[in-house]
Amino acid sequence: MAIHGDRDDELRLFQTGEHPCGYWSDRVARDLVLDPHDRRLGGLYPLALSWGFRRSGDLVYRPHCAHCQACVAVRIPVARFAPDRSQRRCAARNEDLEVRITAATARDDLFALYHRYLTHRHANGGMDDHGPHEFEQFLIGSWSHTRFMEMRLPGHDGQPSQLLGVAVTDVTEHGLSAVYTFFDPDHAARGLGTFAILQQIEWARREGLPHVYLGYWIRGHQKMDYKRRYRPLEAYDGRRWHDFDDELDGR
């Protein structure tokens, strides 16, 4: 499949075969994938985000299932975002943390935290057997401008800070894309997933970026429903972005 244009300008898309859905065990899924060999992929990626695509490793994809449209791309309009009471409490609860933006490079401490997170939060989910190679292949693109937003508890009396969480974040001219967040399960009560998104919103605001892309909200899926708590929120219907409440009303 190709979006029209001459040979140099056309954008090639591939449709995958059916594969087990990563969200619903009783469903199959398929995706549209931008040509992974296209040398322009890094430049096309910001536009692809605005078309509802997402990155995993070096692949840029969008669900394209024959009998299910539950996955809805959502983004936060940074200038209009206002935290609710629960989100303000989460920010206050984590005021003691340091937030650092670091290069997206594989490190032993990062992988150790990632492995602990998967083992405790997603046991038997198909990812808990990831090794260092899978960690790097899944989260770090060879062409993407990716950063790790590290959340750390400061050390005292000469002790080093403690890594509590990492938000893998792509930086583009259209906004930030929240690729994946993992954290220390011993500190789950802090709400580090929520705190990470709040910090990504502030990061985008500082950089003058208009949106934070959260990936897919999935209708009826409990683990993905948290994304609707960030308001205002915009949803992509395959043609344009509109207010998320229109999606809830059945659009």
UniProtKB/Swiss-Prot annotation:
It comes from the Bacteria. It catalyses: N-terminal L-glutamyl-[protein] + L-leucyl-tRNA(Leu) = N-terminal L-leucyl-L-glutamyl-[protein] + tRNA(Leu) + H(+); N-terminal L-aspartyl-[protein] + L-leucyl-tRNA(Leu) = N-terminal L-leucyl-L-aspartyl-[protein] + tRNA(Leu) + H(+). Pfam families: ATE_C, ATE_N. The keyword Acyltransferase applies. The keyword Phosphoprotein does not apply. Functions in the N-end rule pathway of protein degradation where it conjugates Leu from its aminoacyl-tRNA to the N-termini of proteins containing an N-terminal aspartate or glutamate. One of its GO terms (biological process) is ubiquitin-dependent protein catabolic process via the N-end rule pathway. It comes from Stenotrophomonas maltophilia (strain R551-3). One of its GO terms (molecular function) is leucyl-tRNA--protein transferase activity. InterPro entries: Acyl_CoA_acyltransferase (IPR016181), Asp_Glu_LeuTrfase (IPR017138), N-end_Aminoacyl_Trfase (IPR030700), N-end_Aminoacyl_Trfase_C (IPR007472), N-end_Aminoacyl_Trfase_N (IPR007471). This is Aspartate/glutamate leucyltransferase. NCBIfam families: PRK01305.1-1, PRK01305.1-3, PRK01305.2-3. Its EC number is 2.3.2.29. Keywords: Acyltransferase, Cytoplasm, Transferase. The gene is bpt. Belongs to the R-transferase family. Bpt subfamily. GO terms for cellular component: cytoplasm. It is found in: Cytoplasm.
